[in-house]
């Protein structure tokens, strides 16, 4: 079975906002602190519907993408996050998972 961290990276690379949202629990939390260093505020998204809608818009308007993702371990990956062209080296961390492998909390922080 594919590790959750790999599924997360794959959904970002393929810009599949629906599959990304399905990785989370109904009330899952996605928190991205990297955007704080750009012209945007950090992102705090609660619930799979909010995650789906947010990334749908980000992908549609080419405002978010990733480059050079590398899995560090079963719960972390290093990547370059691009926020509307501004690039940040980042670490994505699966903070909390359910027993069936859904994400309760995921954070993305600058490296």
Report each predicted region and the residues it spans.
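Short, aromatic-enriched amphipathic alpha-helices that serve as compact interaction elements
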Residues: 1-16
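Short, charged low-complexity linear motifs
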Residues: 15-19, 40-41
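A beta-strand edge to alpha-helix "cap/lid" segment located at domain peripheries
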Residues: 52-111
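A solvent-exposed, acidic/Ser-Thr-rich amphipathic alpha-helical stretch
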Residues: 25-72
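N-terminal helix-cap/turn-to-beta initiation motif at the start of protein domains
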Residues: 1, 21-22
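Hydrophobic pocket/interface hotspot
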Residues: 8, 20-21, 28, 47, ...
